[in-house]
Every structure is written in C-alpha cells, then in structure tokens.
C-alpha cells in the first residue's frame, strides 16, 4: 500500500484595501457684522480696522478668492461695488497682511502666510448651512484634492467620469 499524501491548500497573499481618508471638510465662513459707513471706509484711521477684519476673514476662510475677500470687506462698510478708491485702500491693506497669493486663470487666491498651497490636501464643498461656492471661488488646490480622492475611490475612470465624479464632490 502506497503512501497517501495530503495536499495543502494554496496560500494566497491578501491585500487589505484601506479606505482613503476623506479630504472633505466644511467651508468655514467669517461672521461679519456691519462695521461702519461707506464714508468711514476711506478714512486713514480705518485702515487698521480693515486690516484686522481682513485677517479675521482669512483666518476663517483662507484660501479665499481676492474677489470674495474684497466683497466681504467692503460689504462690512455698506459698499456694494468696488472701484478705484476701494481698490487703493485695499491694496494698502493687503500689502500689510502676512499672506500667500496663488493665481488660477485670472483669479487670485489669498492664503494665510502659514498655509502652503503645495501641500494643501483638503477640499471644502459647502459651509454649515450647505451653501456652495461658485467654481471660480474654489482654488485649483482644492479641486486637485477632490480629484485625488475620486481616483483613490474609483480607479480606472474615463476623463469624463472623473470630471463628473469630482464635480459631485462640490
């Protein structure tokens, strides 16, 4: 009688796929109350107040488009449209603030001085009330973060599907 050999079941290596960390976070907005009148905005003694308000907004919302920052700042003084006079005041204020600036197409984005656009890896789809920003108000660094999240969730997408899935994030 021959020897009986029992076969061992093959052992396969398994790889556990860990879910990618969610890069989405709420878009925090600065709660801005009216500060003064349009006439007061242009007074030299108002510059430190404008600067403080700009820093407050940047601390909550950076990266933020220059247009959105300007709109919030002048709105605090009841000004609805920017012009040469407001641009001059704000140019002086912006020179005094510790910030970084990136340009996407024709849109400038202001970052806190301590934020590094090269390592920024989150995206902010909406604020706590569900309000969403226009595409022109979202820096490319946030869009890139959303794209990398989509690619980690779904490998092998066509370009059209990647664009659609990324757009759903916002």
Task: Cite the ranges covered by each PLM segment.
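C-terminal non-catalytic scaffold/interaction domains in large multidomain proteins
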Residues: 1-170
């Amino acid at each position: 009688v021959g020897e009986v050999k029992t076969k061992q079941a093959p052992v396969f290596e398994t790889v556990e796929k860990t879910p990618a960390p969610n890069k989405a976070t709420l878009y925090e907005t600065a709660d801005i109350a009216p500060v003064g009148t349009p006439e007061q905005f242009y007074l030299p003694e108002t510059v430190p107040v404008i600067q403080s308000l700009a820093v407050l907004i940047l601390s909550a919302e950076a990266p933020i488009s220059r247009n959105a920052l300007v709109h919030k700042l002048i709105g605090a003084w009841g000004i609805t449209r920017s012009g040469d006079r407001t641009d001059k005041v704000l140019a002086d204020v912006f020179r005094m603030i510790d910030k970084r600036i990136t340009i996407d197409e024709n849109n400038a984005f202001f970052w806190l001085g301590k934020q590094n656009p090269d390592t920024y890896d989150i995206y902010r789809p909406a604020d706590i009330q569900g309000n969403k920003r226009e595409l022109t108000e979202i820096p490319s660094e946030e869009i890139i973060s959303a794209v990398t999240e989509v690619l980690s969730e779904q490998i092998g997408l066509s370009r059209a599907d990647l664009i659609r899935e990324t757009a759903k994030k916002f």
